[in-house]
Design a protein with these regions (language model features):
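Substrate-binding/active-site clefts of carbohydrate-active enzymes
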Residues: 2-126, 130-149, 153-165, 169
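Active-site-proximal helices and loops of the catalytic beta/alpha 8
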Residues: 9-11, 21-22, 47-51, 133-231, ...
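Short loop/turn microsegments at loop-to-beta-strand junctions
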Residues: 49, 225-226, 396-397, 431, ...
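Active-site regions of oxyanion-processing enzymes, predominantly non-cytosolic
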Residues: 127-131, 279-285
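A solvent-exposed, charged loop/short amphipathic helix patch at secondary-structure junctions
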Residues: 241-258, 298-304
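Short strand-edge motifs at loop-to-beta-strand transitions and within beta-strands
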Residues: 398, 408, 479-483
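Short, compositionally biased serine/threonine- and acidic-rich segments at solvent-exposed termini, linkers
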Residues: 415-422
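C-terminal outer-membrane/trafficking sorting elements
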Residues: 426-511
Length: 511
């Protein structure tokens, strides 16, 4: 379901390990991202899969290795010199100051940005740029106020980009006043919308400060779906870490257990991806990544835990997230302009409508059972997208009692049941399954020990979630199935086996 990859700054930064927000050479590819030819291969590979590539450029500032700073430098005061044609001597908008501040109102800085952006587009064929901290594109000491010169500078920047590629994605991390962000959105730019903290509270089961409606473009009074909302980013703590460390509980229902934490993560995704407009997922969020941002330090490298694919609770998050994204891509009702919502408190809902389909998303974010109010658009038969079951609604405004963490997506038109999701899935014990050899050169034996006559289905997914091989058989007591996977490239895959209502997942390595 992913249709764009947004990288952190990949131009040359100071040091060997960094997020990249300490830029030194904006036009040079940092070695951490490979050689230029390898990076081009990456872009081409993404494009062949229908995935756009978006890079991150930091033009608010540059650090000391940058030649523009060094050529006009005041060594006595350790800052850009008064005659520096690109940079301010002092950052004019504290406290948000890093490195050496660019003056975005002078022509040399504009030319510098334009030449670099054009190079990245024409040389590497990137599809968009996320511009870091564009609220800093001002010389005003109060950057939180509306700034007409800043607006003009950003519109000029966007126009230049669209002159090179009319379909180019211009994304701003702006954090400016809403009237300014609305004007930029109206002009065609997209903007980051951080609602992580409200989603944290909802996921942890603390509902008094859990209203995440600010992640909806309509709530801000915007005309277009240009708000990129998200529950996690590089700047925020991992939601799963927050849940497992600080989550709420009541009786036997404890959000801090792995199983319930995973369910709470799915719950929040159900109320992120069903909101119309672009959404962003941070890496491994689909597997409930729960290593703290501060472990061992904020900008330190974090472990890549491929073993998460072998955990059934994390796999559940992965598959439900994939199904939610597939649903929003496949059915237009989840991209409608006609929707309402009630997201305060423990009972939350989203109601979406088109001329031919209505959808209602409803969930209980409390840690206790309680009433929710779906506010169905009409009475009659409604269908649960994830179970395939139906309900008959006789009173559209009547409450329903949900268990803690329970949620549903209802539609008044029967849609194809979500892929990846079976009935209430039970774990198929590892003692009932053998996969040999693993790692494999391509020929794999699958041995399944289940009741005779059981229907067994198996699928192999690549790391993007795409099904690359599948099959099914009717099991004898101990059935050996041979899988020819020689057509697959070397790498890690997920093998999912479903026998009746039982499921088994195993990481499969092709050498």
């Amino acid at each position: 379901g992913v249709n764009a990859i947004e990288l952190m700054p990949n131009s040359e930064f100071e040091g060997n390990s960094s997020w990249g927000y300490n830029p030194s050479f904006h036009m040079a590819l940092d070695k951490y991202y490979g050689t230029p030819d390898k990076f081009k291969e990456f872009v081409d590979s993404c494009h062949s899969r229908g995935i756009a590539v978006i890079t991150d450029q930091v033009y608010n500032h540059a650090y000391g290795q940058n030649p523009i700073a060094q050529m006009w430098w005041d060594g006595t005061n350790n800052r850009p010199a008064a005659d520096n044609p690109y940079m301010n001597q002092n950052c004019p908008h504290p406290p948000n100051c890093w490195g050496n501040d660019f003056d975005h109102y002078v022509q040399p800085t504009r030319d510098y940005m334009d030449r670099i952006n054009t190079y990245w587009i024409e040389e590497f064929k990137i599809d968009g740029i996320r511009f870091d901290f564009t609220k800093g594109f001002t010389n005003n000491s109060n950057a939180d106020n509306y700034s007409a010169p800043r607006i003009a500078a950003l519109k000029r920047l966007a126009d230049t980009l669209w002159g090179v590629d009319q379909d180019f994605y211009v994304i701003l991390e702006h954090w400016g006043p809403n009237n300014e962000e609305k004007e930029l959105s109206d002009y065609g730019m997209m903007l980051w919308g951080n609602v992580a903290h409200a989603y944290y509270e909802a996921a942890m089961g603390f509902t008094s400060n859990s209203d995440f409606k600010w992640g909806i473009y309509k709530e801000r009074g915007w005309n277009d779906k240009h708000l990129i909302s998200y529950t996690e980013s590089h700047d925020e703590e991992r939601a799963s870490y927050k849940i497992k460390t600080y989550g709420n509980s009541s009786g036997s229902y404890d959000t801090r257990t792995l199983a319930t934490m995973a369910d709470r993560k799915i719950l929040t995704h159900a109320f992120l991806y069903t909101i119309p407009g672009p959404k962003m997922m941070y890496m491994f969020e689909e597997l409930a990544y729960d290593i703290s941002i501060d472990n061992p330090c904020r900008i330190c490298e974090k472990p890549i835990l491929w073993s998460y694919y072998e955990n059934n609770h994390r796999q559940k998050v992965y598959f439900y997230t994939a199904a939610l994204i597939e649903m929003r891509k496949k059915y237009g009702v989840f991209n409608t302009d006609n929707f309402t919502y009630a997201l305060n408190g423990g009972a939350k809902r989203i109601n979406l409508s088109t001329t031919d389909t209505n959808a209602t998303v409803v969930g209980n974010f409390r840690v206790t059972a309680g009433d929710v109010y779906p506010n169905f658009q009409h009475t009659g038969t409604w269908y649960d997208y994830f179970t395939g079951d139906s309900i008959v609604v006789t009173n559209a405004t009547a409450p329903m009692t949900y268990q803690p963490g329970e949620w549903h997506v209802y539609t008044d038109v029967k849609l194809n049941k979500a892929s990846f999701i079976g009935e209430e899935e039970m774990e198929l014990a590892a003692t009932n399954v053998a996969v040999y050899p693993n790692p494999s050169s391509g020929n794999v034996e699958l041995l399944v020990d289940v009741a005779e006559g059981t229907d067994v289905r198996y699928q192999v997914y690549d790391i993007t979630g795409k099904s690359v091989h599948e099959g099914n058989f009717n099991a004898a007591l101990y059935r050996v199935e041979y899988m020819d996977l020689n057509h697959l490239s070397s790498g890690a895959y997920l093998l999912k086996i479903q026998a009746g209502s039982a499921v088994y997942n195993e990481r499969l390595l092709i050498e």
